[in-house]
């Protein structure tokens, strides 16, 4: 597996986005299948593992933490806060909350579920526009100083927002959808990443498989290298 530089880390060029193990597009795999997928990814040389508090309303991080705890030193573990499931009388709903106290709570919950003392790369999942980006990133900077996270990333932000955030604390990565169909990062974000030394971490390079002719569910057919 080829590698790339991601902030202070050397990671596999292809990472495993874990969202679909418990959340979002189509029927998620069983926990047993999810475990097999995670272990197969490690076998194939994947070292970049990406999850979030939102995915499965915590179930995704719990699965990743349980399965990958024995391999913690072999991976760069990424998660996200600022968007999570919140309990309401009519069920759990997605809430964007970038207040410092919410981010601290999200991080502590993620550390517990992931069974780790520190998250390598912690993204602000979405910018809460009711909260200045400087306040949200300032809270994440405090988590770096406290040893809870090692580095900070942003997800789905504009170039202008990236520059504002980077002025508070170095941003090592911007996660954004990028594919043949979705080219939004080319509108200034790629240039901003280059100028600031931040990596662009592209998700859904196959546009969530919505334009593919078939889906692949047999992990025994996954290629051994990339």
Question: What positions do the PLM features span?
Answer:
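Generic structural signal for well-ordered alpha-helices
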Residues: 1, 38, 61, 65, ...
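Short, acidic/polar
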Residues: 28-41, 96-114, 158-164
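Conserved small/polar residues in nucleotide/adenosyl-binding loops
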Residues: 210-214, 226
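N-terminal binding-site loop/beta-alpha segment at the start of enzyme catalytic domains
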Residues: 1-79, 207
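Beta/alpha (TIM)-barrel catalytic core signal, keyed to glycine-rich beta->alpha loops juxtaposed to Asp/Glu
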Residues: 127-211, 221
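Active-site groove signature of glycoside hydrolases
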Residues: 111-129
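Active-site mouth loops of central-metabolism enzymes
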Residues: 20-32, 89-104, 125, 130
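Conserved, mostly hydrophobic/aromatic
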Residues: 6, 16, 34, 41, ...
């Amino acid at each position: 597996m080829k590698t790339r530089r991601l902030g202070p880390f050397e990671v596999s060029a292809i990472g495993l986005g874990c969202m679909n193990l418990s959340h979002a597009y189509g029927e998620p795999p069983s926990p047993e299948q999810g475990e097999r997928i995670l272990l197969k990814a490690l076998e194939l040389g994947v070292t970049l593992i990406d999850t979030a508090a939102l995915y499965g309303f915590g179930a995704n991080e719990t699965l990743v933490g349980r399965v990958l705890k024995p391999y913690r030193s072999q991976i760069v573990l990424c998660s996200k806060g600022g968007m999570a499931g919140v309990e309401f009388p009519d069920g759990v709903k997605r809430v964007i909350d970038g207040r410092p106290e919410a981010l601290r709570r999200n991080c502590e919950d993620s550390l517990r579920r992931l069974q780790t003392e520190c998250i390598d790369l912690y993204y602000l999942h979405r910018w809460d526009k009711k909260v200045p980006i400087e306040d949200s990133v300032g809270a994440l900077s405090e988590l770096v100083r406290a040893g809870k996270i090692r580095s900070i990333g942003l997800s789905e932000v504009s170039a202008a927002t990236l520059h504002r955030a980077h002025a508070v604390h170095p941003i090592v990565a911007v996660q954004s959808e990028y594919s043949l169909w979705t080219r939004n990062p080319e509108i200034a974000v790629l240039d901003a990443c280059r100028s600031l030394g931040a990596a662009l971490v592209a998700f859904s390079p196959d546009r969530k498989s919505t334009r593919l002719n078939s889906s692949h569910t047999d992990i025994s057919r996954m290629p051994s290298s990339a």
